[in-house]
């Protein structure tokens, strides 16, 4: 279990919280810890404070109230939808189904950076150092970098909580592995939990039921 879930349990979940995570983001200790992480050390303090506060405020707004009960929580994207699904399943000990109709992290980051939508996004963040496709854009800005890292890491955080994840085609599953989906761990048991589920259906598989209805 990702240790970051303890922040949710202790600082956000209304059923278990003992402090406000949102309030914590304004403390000196929190900002010092965040400011020493990777490229964030290069971000001016004022910009970093508001960047972090914007991200955390969305998470807090989504999760600080008690989530409704469901036997299965379903999201068809990673990002905030998966965060809600994973949190709900954690709260009630139920299931979380992720059906990735497309790779939301890849598409969202590529849209933000104005890259070709088919280009892969990976957890080594090499894509942030690539030459921009449109010369007028210049280097990736600190805001774009922070935004991209936030969405990639949010996906990596949510993926392991899925009881099952589906993909439309094999390449999508492999790209999900590159973004941080634990495909090998999900498929190491007796039954695969990360599977290919293409669009459409085989008519013969439902023919019997169809003809029974016509009778």
Predicted regions and their residues:
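Histidine-centered beta-alpha loop that forms part of the nucleotide-sugar donor binding/catalytic region
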Residues: 100-103, 198-199
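A short, active-site helix/loop in glycosyltransferases that binds the activated sugar's phosphate group
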Residues: 27, 148-190
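Short N-terminal targeting/anchoring amphipathic segment
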Residues: 64-80, 94-97, 101
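Non-catalytic, alpha-helical, charged scaffold/linker segments
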Residues: 1-47
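Membrane-proximal helix-turn-helix segments that form the acceptor-binding/catalytic region
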Residues: 60-69, 104, 125-164
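A conserved, positively charged/aromatic
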Residues: 108-119, 155-162
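Acidic anion/phosphate-binding donor-loop and adjacent secondary structure
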Residues: 177, 183-214
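An amphipathic, basic-hydrophobic alpha-helix
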Residues: 47-72, 83-84
């Amino acid at each position: 279990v990702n240790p970051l879930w303890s922040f949710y349990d202790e600082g956000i979940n209304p059923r278990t919280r003992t402090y406000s995570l949102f309030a914590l983001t304004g403390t000196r200790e929190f900002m010092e810890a965040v400011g020493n992480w990777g490229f964030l050390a290069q971000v001016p303090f004022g910009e970093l404070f508001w960047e972090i506060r914007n991200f955390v405020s969305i998470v807090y707004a989504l999760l600080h109230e008690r989530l409704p009960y469901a036997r299965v929580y379903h999201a068809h994207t990673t990002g905030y939808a998966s965060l809600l699904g994973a949190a709900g399943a954690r709260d009630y000990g139920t299931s979380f189904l992720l059906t990735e109709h497309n790779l939301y992290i890849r598409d969202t980051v590529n849209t933000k950076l104005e890259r070709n939508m088919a280009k892969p996004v990976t957890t080594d963040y090499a894509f942030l150092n690539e030459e921009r496709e449109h010369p007028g854009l210049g280097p990736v800005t600190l805001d774009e970098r922070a935004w991209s890292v936030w969405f990639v890491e949010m996906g990596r955080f949510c993926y392991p909580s899925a009881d099952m994840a589906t993909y439309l085609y094999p390449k999508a599953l492999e790209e999900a592995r590159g973004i941080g989906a634990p495909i090998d761990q999900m498929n190491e048991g007796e039954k695969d939990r990360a599977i290919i589920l293409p669009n459409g259906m085989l008519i013969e598989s439902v023919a019997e039921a169809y003809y029974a209805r016509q009778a």
